[in-house]
Amino acid sequence: MSAESPEPASAEEQKEMEDKVLSPEKAEEAKLKARYPHLGQKPGGSDFLRKRLQKGQKYFDSGDYNMAKAKMKNKQLPTAAPDKTEVTGDHIPTPQDLPQRKPSLVASKLAG
């Protein structure tokens, strides 16, 4: 058991390596911030966004408006009757199960 894994680098060495890796990005970022100081991120977002949010909610269409209006009223929508026990799809119909077609009152032009 003399083959041990190499000892991890100390915290100072790791920090120094990270600084070497990140320093080009940080240097570029510092240059851009010095060149364009007015483009810094504002905590609340852009002025345009803040103004739009102050105006109130806008709706995409009348459906969105009506849904929001219904939520405000907490109006219960009518539900289907619970006594309905009809099951659909319980069997596959065959030609014998189907009712006879009624003859049409209007003669078809194709029948000739």
Curated annotation (Swiss-Prot):
InterPro entries: Endosulphine
Alphabetized UniProt keyword annotations: Cell cycle, Cell division, Cytoplasm, Mitosis, Phosphoprotein, Protein phosphatase inhibitor
Biased amino acid composition, Low complexity: 1-11
One GO term of the biological process aspect: cell division
Molecular function (Gene Ontology), one example: protein phosphatase regulator activity
PTM comment text: Phosphorylation at Ser-62 by MASTL/GWL during mitosis is essential for interaction with PPP2R2D (PR55-delta) and subsequent inactivation of PP2A.
Subcellular location field: Cytoplasm
The keyword Membrane belongs to this UniProt entry's keyword annotation: no
Cell cycle among keywords: yes
Residues bearing PTM Phosphoserine: 62, 104
Region Disordered, annotated ranges: 1-49, 72-112
Residue stretches of biased makeup (Basic and acidic residues): 12-32
Assembly mode: Interacts (when phosphorylated at Ser-62) with PPP2R2D.
Function: Protein phosphatase inhibitor that specifically inhibits protein phosphatase 2A (PP2A) during mitosis. Inhibition of PP2A is enhanced when ARPP19 is phosphorylated. When phosphorylated at Ser-62 during mitosis, specifically interacts with PPP2R2D (PR55-delta) and inhibits its activity, leading to inactivation of PP2A, an essential condition to keep cyclin-B1-CDK1 activity high during M phase.
Family to which this protein belongs: Belongs to the endosulfine family.
Name used for this protein in its record: cAMP-regulated phosphoprotein 19
